[in-house]
């Protein structure tokens, strides 16, 4: 409730930023909150990841410390959706649609994967549709300066090769070129 004291306190502790979640609306009051949060975190040189928020609408142009915005039906939804989207197809739509608006906190990187016919929503042991390689590719395809790992630490410890790959992927790129793609079918992206 006292945003300035919270930001000051955590900045003094050496914390580098916040991931704020569960805003889940886009009315004027919430928009004002997001601007206050961006302004206050900038004042204390803190990064800001606005999860559970509408797609970006320019806030990060005024406050570059606001580095991520969810604004997407992220991978976490696979834990509880009774009628999940066709996730594989969805993931090759969002780079063409949502990604155009700016950085996206999608929370990819699932290590438990299943073919569409074997997939089921499970809150206690979440999984994703498709392959693990597809999950890894999302770290390159999706623009996200502050990537999250969606799975449990023990799953990444068991899959060290995947963890090493994710750790080596830059989060900021000098150039991005979509070489080819078809909405809902595939995307080929080159970054350097």
Residue ranges and their predicted role:
Residues 116-142, 147, 182-184, 191-192:
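Long hydrophobic segments that form regular secondary structure
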Residues 41, 66-69, 106, 138-141, ...:
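Generic structural hydrophobic/aromatic packing signal, biased to beta-strands
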Residues 151-192:
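Glycan-recognition and catalytic regions of carbohydrate-active enzymes
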Residues 96-97, 137, 173:
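Generic hydrophobic, helix-prone segments enriched in Leu/Val/Ile
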Residues 1-127, 131:
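Aromatic- and carboxylate-enriched substrate-binding clefts and catalytic-loop regions
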Residues 103, 134-135, 159-163:
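Alpha-helix initiation and N-capping motif
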Residues 73, 110-112, 117, 142, ...:
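A generic structural micro-environment signature
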């Amino acid at each position: 409730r006292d945003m300035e004291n919270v930001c000051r306190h955590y900045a003094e502790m050496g914390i580098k930023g916040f991931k704020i979640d569960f805003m889940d609306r886009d009315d004027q009051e919430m928009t004002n909150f997001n601007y206050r949060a961006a302004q206050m975190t900038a004042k204390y040189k803190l990064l800001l990841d606005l999860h559970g928020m509408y797609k970006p609408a320019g806030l990060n142009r005024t406050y570059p410390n606001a580095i991520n915005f969810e604004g997407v039906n992220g991978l976490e939804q696979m834990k509880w959706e009774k009628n999940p989207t066709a996730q594989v197809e969805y993931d090759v739509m969002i780079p063409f649609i949502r990604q155009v608006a700016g950085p996206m906190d999608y929370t990819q990187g699932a290590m438990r994967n299943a073919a569409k016919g074997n997939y089921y929503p499970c809150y206690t042991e979440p999984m994703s549709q498709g392959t693990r390689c597809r999950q890894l590719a999302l770290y390159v395809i999706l623009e996200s300066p502050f990537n999250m790992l969606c799975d449990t630490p023990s799953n990444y410890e068991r899959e060290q090769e995947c963890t090493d790959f994710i750790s080596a992927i830059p989060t900021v790129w000098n150039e991005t070129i979509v070489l080819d793609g078809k909405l809902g079918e595939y995307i080929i992206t080159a970054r350097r």
